[in-house]
UniProtKB/Swiss-Prot annotation:
ATG1-binding, as annotated region: 441-500
Basic and acidic residues bias locations: 424-439
Organism: Kluyveromyces marxianus (strain DMKU3-1042 / BCC 29191 / NBRC 104275) (Yeast)
PTM: Hyperphosphorylated under nutrient-rich conditions. Starvation and TOR inactivation results in ATG13 partial dephosphorylation leading to ATG1-binding. Dephosphorylation induces ATG17-binding.
Region (Disordered): 388-443, 568-611
Subunit (UniProt): Hypophosphorylated form interacts with ATG1 to form the ATG1-ATG13 kinase complex. The ATG1-ATG13 complex interacts with the ATG17-ATG29-ATG31 complex through direct interaction with ATG17. Interacts with VAC8.
Name this polypeptide is given: Autophagy-related protein 13
Length: 712
């Protein structure tokens, strides 16, 4: 290995050490005039023209990155800058102001140990290496530049100057400046607030080749402000972060790179909620803040003031800020509002204070109420939690007669939280309130949920209260509009079922009363009536036989035609009983007469001619009378309407096809044209039905009378 290579390796090792020392000493606030145990570096404090102090602890931690020999690979060096929260108590809460000045609750004391502010990545990228040299003459100059230690040193000097400047411009430097100013006024801060500054800035070295965990702390990738939750910028970096890269320096063994990712919003502050009545030494400063706030509220005509026992807002007197003005520690006064998105109190339950008029301040923890944007809901809930009671401002009462109003009661579906704070302050201003119990505070899950609601800038709760009523009204109107249609349908069906009743009675041998129909559709019985079936069998058989004989003889002599007995389905009866085959279907059959020449076989019946002529006249009159009132299918001589039969009159087929059966059933008929369906069974059944006549007349004509209405 040549001397130039050894010098380059030494510069690379010093690069890692100097960068770590510079970043740590720029971020850590000096305590007592210097760092504990500081020692000068062996190579001096002015390496790369940047002054740094020696730190043996850091040098021991960074040893794996300062022992590069030119052969082994070096893992990336990660240096994190974080805000240490381990000094917070359980009654202290950390908040963050966004760019618009809205407070966002970060965590309560004891919940998280730290908040990561910056993450620096220092590495030697071995992907680019010029150890093999160059064979092209045009690249000799570039190759020599990479292998020149003096040139590399100059580039590193410029890099560290830029690095130091960058550390002074990052947002975390603002916190460091404020902490330094607050430590200079520690005595004054202790007198004013009764507590020391609990926040500190620290750094940590990590191995970049290992995963970085964020358990128990607020990691860099976690957005605190909800508006940054689901947005990404063009560089695929979370919108609450920004990234800066320093131009890499190429060497013979690789490229030296420095990259930083940091939070844009770092305006953190702490609210102490332990003893609100103890902080009374600086009441005049508080009143000045209230007066300035009153002026701000009065100048805005869109802001209304309202104070309610169930909705109280506090002006917290004890903000422990991370900033200060001048040489002293100035307390941060802020007005935060508490909203209740899940519960609305009664209109007349609270005291009314006129807008723009705040004339009395009763204690160091007064209550101001105003309309605020939805982005302050989360922080306002936490501010509400820290008060033992809220003062109802009343312009008509003097400050010494004012009393603390009843405390807020915050309840929601996410948990049971009851607050009891009804304190009368008429006895003494210096009276100490009891510390609040930790279990009376709202859970962080509820506050995190409220943060999710901040995606919408404006929440209008009025439409949501009207929507259910509109849905009910729309449903009722729609239901009422269906009633006339239902009545019309019922009337039309009733008329269609009863229009053919008189005509059917003229052509029927039934003596049953006129059937009546109801517009209400009754349920279809599941079983046939056994009593109706048994009582009607005897009379049905006798009546059908006599009627069949007379009609068959009269029509046979009159037309002289061969009648083809066919069975057509006019309607279909549907029942709901699937257990019995007897009540599955009830068909109404029609007749079709086919014209044609047939043999006249009535010559053997000369003795009945006179009687047949009378029957022919009666039959023709019945047919003419029936066809005058209703239209029938072109393919049928008669059409018998199903609607003319009542429930007890609908005939059903017997399983043996010997005797017709009638039973009571409710059915809805579907009317259509009759179709011709030949039925051989009825032809065969006609032999049994007409056994008393001659053999040559038995096969001529058969009236299917199963669709006629016969009474018991």
């Amino acid at each position: 290995m040549s001397d130039s290579d050894r010098e380059i390796i030494g510069l690379i090792n010093n690069f890692f050490l100097k960068a770590a020392l510079l970043l740590e000493q720029c971020k850590v606030v000096a305590r007592g005039g210097g760092f504990d145990g500081e020692e000068p570096l062996r190579d001096g404090n002015h390496l790369f023209n940047i002054e740094t102090r020696g730190d043996p602890t850091l040098e021991a931690q960074i040893q794996p990155w300062t022992t590069f020999d030119g052969e082994k690979s070096m893992p990336p060096l990660v240096l994190e800058t974080f805000l240490d929260l381990r000094g917070l108590h359980s009654n202290q809460t950390v908040y963050l102001h966004d760019s618009d000045g809205n407070p966002w609750m970060v965590c309560k004391g004891g919940k998280k140990s730290e908040i990561v502010l910056e993450r620096w990545l220092i590495e030697l990228d071995r992907q680019f290496s010029s150890t093999t040299g160059s064979t092209d003459a045009a690249e000799d100059d570039e190759y020599n530049e990479f292998n020149d230690p003096e040139n590399l040193h100059k580039q590193l000097v410029l890099l560290f100057r830029y690095l130091y400047t960058l550390t002074q411009l990052l947002p975390a430097n603002d916190i460091i400046t404020k902490l330094q100013a607050s430590q200079q006024g520690t005595a004054q801060a202790t007198t004013t607030t009764g507590t020391l500054k609990p926040l500190h800035i620290h750094t940590r070295l990590l191995d970049g080749s290992k995963p970085i965990l964020s358990k128990g702390r607020v990691g860099l990738s976690k957005p605190i402000i909800a508006s940054y939750s689901n947005t990404m910028n063009e560089t695929n970096i979370a919108s609450h972060l920004e990234q800066r890269k320093i131009t890499p320096i190429k060497t013979k063994f690789g490229s030296l790179r420095i990259t930083v990712s940091y939070r844009k919003d770092v305006d953190f502050y702490v609210i102490d909620q332990e003893d609100p009545y103890k902080r009374t030494t600086n009441v005049s400063a508080l009143q000045d803040t209230v007066t300035a706030t009153d002026r701000r509220i009065s100048s805005n005509s869109n802001i209304s003031i309202s104070v309610s026992p169930k909705t109280t807002n506090m002006l917290n007197a004890n903000h422990i800020p991370v900033d200060s003005s001048g040489g002293g520690f100035a307390r941060r006064q802020s007005i935060s509002s508490k909203l209740q998105p899940f519960k609305v109190g009664s209109v007349g339950s609270g005291s009314f204070v006129q807008s723009g008029s705040l004339q009395s301040v009763t204690n160091p923890n007064p209550s101001l109420s105003r309309n605020v944007s939805s982005s302050s809901v989360a922080a306002a809930l936490k501010v509400q939690r820290g008060s033992a009671g809220s003062t109802v401002l009343n312009s008509d009462l003097p400050p010494e007669l004012s009393s603390v109003g009843s405390g807020s009661k915050y309840s929601s579906s996410f948990g049971r939280i009851r607050r009891h704070s009804s304190v009368r302050r008429s006895e003494s201003i210096d009276r100490t309130a009891k510390p609040r119990k930790s279990n009376e505070t709202p859970p962080e899950d509820l506050l995190e949920f409220v943060k999710l609601l901040e995606d919408k800038k404006e929440l209008n709760m009025k439409p949501s209260t009207i929507l259910p009523q509109q849905d009910i009204s729309s449903s009722l109107i729609k239901f009422q509009s269906m009633k006339p249609n239902n009545d019309t349908l019922s009337d039309n069906l009733s008329m269609s079922m009863s229009i053919d009743q008189p005509n059917m009675r003229m052509g029927s041998n039934s003596h049953s009363p006129i059937p009546s129909f109801s517009p209400n559709y009754g349920s279809i019985p599941s079983r046939l009536s056994q009593g109706s079936r048994n009582n009607s069998n005897v009379e049905l058989i006798t009546s059908r036989k006599s009627s069949l004989d007379r009609h068959r003889l009269s029509l046979l002599n009159r037309t002289g035609s061969n009648v083809d007995i066919r069975r057509g389905s006019v309607g279909t009866m549907e029942t709901t009983n699937e257990d019995s085959k007897e009540d599955e279907d009830s068909h109404v059959h029609g007749l079709r007469f086919n014209s044609g020449t047939v043999n006249d076989k009535t010559e053997d019946n000369n003795e009945d001619d006179d009687e047949e002529e009378i029957l022919i006249k009666r039959s023709s009159n019945a047919v003419a009378s029936s066809t005058e009132h209703f239209s029938v299918s072109p393919r049928s001589a008669r059409s018998i309407s199903v609607s003319s039969y009542t429930r007890s009159q609908l005939p059903l087929k017997h399983p043996n096809f010997s005797y017709p059966t009638t039973s009571a059933t409710t059915a809805h008929a579907k009317f259509h044209k009759s179709e011709v369906i030949p039925d051989q069974l009825h032809r065969e059944g006609s032999h049994h039905h007409n056994s008393s006549h001659k053999n040559d007349e038995d096969d001529d004509l058969l009236f299917v009378m199963s669709d006629m209405n016969l009474t018991n």
